[in-house]
């Protein structure tokens, strides 16, 4: 079964639209395009369902290699928080990440809404080399 499929079943049973569902297993958020077996989820496993608030939105982060990562965020999320989400997905430590939006480097202590970053905005991720400035 795909994760989308599981969300559709939850909608049938509970009436919760899939776009408001976040499924978590072993501390990881499950992505729609993947299957239960991709995450090694077996029978009798327990998934956690977290409801996404209406304020939730997706933003995109483009890396220098041209890869685009999709993140689920809230406007109130701090830049540190966004870097932690990138670390979860990509394994890049936050202290090596520099995030750029509209030509500005984003500061950890600020929030997405401070920078007027709205849904479907694209941030650019630049890696800071170890020992570099």
UniProtKB/Swiss-Prot annotation:
The keyword tRNA processing does not apply. It holds the Pfam family ubiquitin. Keywords: Cytoplasm, Isopeptide bond, Nucleus, Repeat, Ubl conjugation. GO terms for cellular component: cytoplasm; nucleus. Coiled coil: none annotated. It is found in: Cytoplasm; Nucleus. The keyword Cytoplasm applies. For the sake of clarity sequence features are annotated only for the first chain, and are not repeated for each of the following chains. Belongs to the ubiquitin family. PANTHER family: UBIQUITIN. This is Polyubiquitin.
